[in-house]
């Protein structure tokens, strides 16, 4: 779907690749861009920063809360009309603890934001898209959703769920011959601050590159887009290599199983 003259909603749109995608959509001629974020000050700053590029509006939303999503969706529809392109981008990494040290709160927070949040948001807009016969849903997941990673068990679990749901949603739309498109984006780790401290054999991705390729995938109506080497070949290698070989290649040689050992994450203001 072409972004020009479309109304685009980006969750987590006030930092990282969400903010970059919001900016790029305006540069591509979007009719209006809507950013959702949990941080009201960040919303005000983002709207002010991007307003010179076009029409941009921001609303507070906690995507972990169905009630908050309901309120934000109603406000968005009343103020901005129908959403043509939904980019489910918001996400977190709670910590780098092993699973045995996690709490119920850690589990709920990660699953609610990284897996269920995109589902809550999509439910509020997909009905309108189907009845209008136009729409594109882009889900930003992660190559971690195809791997087992120590000290990242909650994040990988949520991203496995997100990929499975996103791909299933795409197939449902295709089976009913709906014009509504679904794109799953699975990038490797991104240099946005969210992954600060990670040490990787593979290249940490510049956020501008991820944003550019994600938006290009929307414009080309791609169903799936992996970004960087691991995202392209993980499934193939898991399918053809014995489990011990895969662990040796990615865990021992490439060091993927120790990437979280020095994780610090984005510093809080």
Regions found by a protein language model. Give the residues of each.
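Substrate-binding pocket helix/loop in short-chain dehydrogenase/reductase
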Residues: 97-99, 103-109
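Active-site helix of classical SDR
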Residues: 122, 158
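Conserved glycine-rich Rossmann-like NAD(P)H-binding loop of the short-chain dehydrogenase/reductase
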Residues: 30-45
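The beta1-alpha1 cofactor-binding region of Rossmann-like NAD(H)/NADP(H)-dependent oxidoreductases
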Residues: 40-41, 60-71, 104
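Canonical Rossmann dinucleotide-binding motif of NAD(H)/NADP(H)-dependent dehydrogenases/reductases
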Residues: 2-34
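SDR active-site lid
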Residues: 171-231
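Residue(s) in the substrate-gating loop at a strand-loop-helix junction
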Residues: 142
């Amino acid at each position: 779907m072409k972004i020009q003259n479309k109304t685009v909603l980006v969750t987590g749109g006030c930092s990282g690749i969400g903010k970059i995608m919001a900016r790029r959509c305006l540069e591509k001629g979007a009719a209006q861009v809507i950013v959702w974020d949990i941080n009201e000050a960040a919303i005000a700053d983002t709207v002010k920063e991007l307003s010179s590029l076009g029409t941009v509006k921001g609303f507070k939303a906690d995507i972990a809360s169905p009630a908050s999503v309901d309120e934000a969706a109603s406000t968005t529809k009343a103020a901005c009309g129908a959403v043509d392109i939904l980019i489910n981008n918001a996400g977190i990494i709670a910590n780098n603890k092993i699973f045995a040290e996690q709490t119920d709160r850690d589990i709920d927070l990660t699953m609610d934001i990284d897996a269920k949040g995109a589902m809550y948001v999509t439910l509020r807009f997909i009905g309108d898209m189907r009845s209008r016969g136009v729409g594109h849903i882009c889900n930003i997941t992660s190559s971690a959703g195809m791997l087992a990673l120590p000290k990242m068990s909650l994040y990988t679990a949520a991203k496995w769920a997100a990929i499975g749901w996103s791909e299933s949603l795409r197939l449902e739309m295709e089976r009913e011959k709906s014009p509504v498109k679904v794109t799953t984006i699975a990038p490797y780790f991104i240099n946005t601050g969210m992954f600060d401290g990670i040490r990787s054999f593979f290249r940490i991705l510049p956020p501008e590159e991820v944003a550019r390729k994600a938006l290009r995938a929307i414009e080309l109506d791609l169903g799936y887009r992996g970004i960087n080497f691991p995202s392209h070949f993980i499934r193939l290698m898991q399918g053809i290599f014995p489990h011990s070989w895969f662990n040796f290649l990615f865990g021992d040689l490439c060091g993927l199983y120790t990437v979280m050992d020095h994780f610090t994450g984005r510093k809080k203001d």
